[in-house]
Amino acid sequence: MIYQLHEFHKTVMAPAVVWADTTRHFFTNPLSPLAYTPVSRTISANSEMFVRLLRRYPKPEWGIDEVISNGERVTVTREIAIDKPFCQLLHFRKSLDVAQPKLLIVAPLSGHYATLLRDTVRTALVDHDVWITDWADAKMVPLAAGPFHLDDYVDYICEFIRALSPQLNVMSVCQPTVPVLGAVSLMASQNDPAVPKAMIMMGGPIDTRRNPTSVNDFAAGRPHSWFSDRVIMRVPGNYPGFMRKVYPGFLQHASFLAMNPDRHMNAHRQFYNHLIRGDGDSADAHRNFYDEYNAVLDMPAEYYLDTIKVVFQEFQLPKGNWSVRGSLVRPETIRKTALFTIEGELDDISGNGQTEAAQTLARNIPAEKRKHLLAKGLGHYGIFSGRKFRETVYPQIRNFIRLMSQREADLKLVRMR
């Protein structure tokens, strides 16, 4: 019923949103006489605040049309490499003939769209041939497509890795560190020749017993039935996924805001002041950030509940009792894949040590194929986007991939001799 009420509220308020947006245009358009009245900025600012509070936020565009790569400006086209019911594997193809290391970026399925990693993709495209998982909004997936469990997520990752191998590097950001480690572990235990060359794991909940955050405490402090009873809802009839059980994006968005309410209130207060002062650049920066932040998707209920149980309540991966399709996940079987774990010193979602735990679990990876980075002064989002990511974190990722490629090439030369 809550989902239906949410949709009813959005629908009822839609005319008011249109009216407020029209008012904003009248008082900001340079061709309108109303834009030059003493109260124009105040009226337009209040109108925009109203619109942004009540409007729907669609999935943002990628907006990556060109990059500088190999010293030249090249165009970028986005192609669907693999189309699955719950995910599209996207390839950012560059008009460049030079072969570059292949990089699969596994985006989180945790409420936001994969476009949250736009800066990650744009930065990586300079030196790599990039693919990314673009997870579907569950309310848009027909019920006939069936359920989607955490095991299905792992299956998807295995399929994508096999499709892009050999010589593939995999980067997982936050939530997918667990299923990616699970996928690579299963492939390694089966002696699958398609195992990736390197894994880069960033800010993920491998072992949430280490330095638990408020997010971890919230998940661990309630019985599993609390989540299935309180936050799982059926999709309303105005979406293709009608009757599918989901964890709604608007609930996840509310939890995001509740983590740092003062920060978000201050950001919106400053945005209002920017509008009043006519500070267009600062206002645009706010719009760009919150257009992305406010765009959320629904998660399949099965996957969400599996993740709560496996990752946050029973700690099955670090305890060594996580099974996927009846096969035990054994990270100690990984030997050929290099591992680079990255954490943010100020991360308030995945605490320090939670991602580094992968180094302990995958204990048979040779020392020369390991690296860990604690990024000083960076929070959760700072380790994969922003200026400091581009200047301090990404160069180490690029160099790690290059080093592993060079060592593999050197080893092949030695064997040939």
Model regions: which residues?
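Alpha/beta-hydrolase-fold enzymes
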Residues: 1-45, 165-166, 183-302
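Conserved alpha/beta-hydrolase "acid-adjacent" motif
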Residues: 348-354
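Conserved acidic catalytic loop of the alpha/beta-hydrolase fold
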Residues: 140-142, 152-169, 181-185
